[in-house]
Amino acid sequence: MNSSDEEKQLQLITSLKEQAIGEYEDLRAENQKTKEKCDKIRQERDEAVKKLEEFQKISHMVIEEVNFMQNHLEIEKTCRESAEALATKLNKENKTLKRISMLYMAKLGPDVITEEINIDDEDSTTDTDGAAETCVSVQCQKQIKELRDQIVSVQEEKKILAIELENLKSKLVEVIEEVNKVKQEKTVLNSEVLEQRKVLEKCNRVSMLAVEEYEEMQVNLELEKDLRKKAESFAQEMFIEQNKLKRQSHLLLQSSIPDQQLLKALDENAKLTQQLEEERIQHQQKVKELEEQLENETLHKEIHNLKQQLELLEEDKKELELKYQNSEEKARNLKHSVDELQKRVNQSENSVPPPPPPPPPLPPPPPNPIRSLMSMIRKRSHPSGSGAKKEKATQPETTEEVTDLKRQAVEEMMDRIKKGVHLRPVNQTARPKTKPESSKGCESAVDELKGILGTLNKSTSSRSLKSLDPENSETELERILRRRKVTAEADSSSPTGILATSESKSMPVLGSVSSVTKTALNKKTLEAEFNSPSPPTPEPGEGPRKLEGCTSSKVTFQPPSSIGCRKKYIDGEKQAEPVVVLDPVSTHEPQTKDQVAEKDPTQHKEDEGEIQPENKEDSIENVRETDSSNC
């Protein structure tokens, strides 16, 4: 495995070396091409510089010739001016001579003078013209012609030279542009040459590193090959010796009597095996050390490469830090602007006028009479917590609690209707007989409740609902509304009546049920049943008794010591509803509404006079509402 890995590494190194050499040769060829281009550009530049020098020399020669021509022109101008001055002098002299001749002629006769003058004039004109012509033709005309010819030739030469100068200037501009282009190309080529030099240097470094690694790997390979050969030869020798010793030991063991030589051979065999194991361990340690050295060398090289990469990354990090600082400054500026905008927004919001006051709170929600029934059921299930519930009864309930209690009460009542209610026995001896006024109200309420509970067990109750009169329902509604007004006024002054009034308001008015219960009640018969001796109460272990048809419950009032929720009826200002506890009482026979009416129809009116109407209506309303909830 090691030899195959080493061969693979050698192949990789050779391939990398060949790639580096090929890249190096390509770069060298490109460098030579760029050098040739640079030499050509230099030659062109030198030729352009030579042409520029020649043009400069020619321009200097032309300028010298132009200066010479200008000097010659100035000389000719001076000669012409001197010739003109001589001509003017000669004209003046001729005029003076004419005047003198005129003076001499004046002494002669006029005819002679006129003739002579005419002759003289003609002669003088001819003489002057001839003298001028002679003067011009002889002395100056040649010079003037020569000068004119020279001026024309000089002007032509001047024009030619001006044209040549313009051409030379345009050529100079072109040459200068070419030189600038050459310089730019030279700079570009120099930059490319520098880049290629850097690439060549990198390639040289890489090639050097590759060559060094290749040489090191070759040295390590040779060392490992030598060590492997030595180890193989040593192992083969030891294997041969071990086989010899095994044979000798086998022969000695075959012999029946062990000799001293056999013991010595065995001892030598043991020693040799120990030496073999020690040398094998040393060989393994050496191999491990060599492998660690190779790994360390590779690690050093990797560390060097990683350091170079770290330097590059640090430079990138510095650039990124600068960008980060700039972005942070921008973010701070933006935050500052955002804070200012938020302050402005807050100021604008603060400056807005305050909102109008909230509307007044809504009136308290109408309480539920089911809550009283729930409290009774809870007292039955949790008698120990009656005191805490009594303290909480004075606090006003919210709408959410009322709805929860309604739901719980309905669920519990449905469960009790389905499964049956386990009622506890009543201890009649523990009833305190104090305050006769309150006992009267309690008895009347109990009578009414018992009669209503009896009517619920009859099958004829559903039929009686259909035969109700609208007049009775209307009168019952009016009576209930009047009673509620009175109880609201009374409970506003008493702390115990707040819950009762709130509960009584939450239940909807059931006029039909109240009318049915009113027509069905016979107070005298109910009172007689209540006062009649009750059957023996069951023991706590017996449980509820099964009745034929249905079970009715007896309504009792317990003192505050046992229940903690007894209420008093006061004739004057304070009124409150009694807390009802349902106790199991086995009825002998289910009485219908007709049977109750047949017993004593005359006692209903007599009992109405004894019981106060307001307390009576409260108890009836409570029984009706509990009855409706059970339904």
Curated annotation (Swiss-Prot):
This protein's UniProt keywords: Acetylation, Cell projection, Coiled coil, Cytoplasm, Cytoskeleton, Developmental protein, Phosphoprotein
Locate the Phosphothreonine modifications and list their residues.
T487, T496, T537
Q: How is it modified after translation?
A: Phosphorylated on Ser-101 and Ser-249 by PAK1 through a CDC42- and RAC1-dependent signaling pathway, which enhances its association with F-actin retrograde flow in filopodia and lamellipodia of axonal growth cones. Phosphorylation on Ser-101 and Ser-249 is increased by netrin-1.
Q: Which residues are modified to N-acetylmethionine?
A: M1
Its principal location? other
Q: What are the protein's GO molecular function terms?
A: actin filament binding; cadherin binding; identical protein binding; kinesin binding
List all Polar residues biased stretches.
456-465, 490-505, 550-561
The PTM Phosphoserine maps to S3, S4, S101, S249, S375, S473, S494, S506, S515, S532, S534
Coiled-coil positions are 7-353
> What does the entry's domain section say?
The N-terminus region is necessary for interaction with actin retrograde filament flow and accumulation in neuronal growth cones.
The name this protein goes by in its record:
Shootin-1
Q: Which organism is it from?
A: Homo sapiens
Originating gene: SHTN1
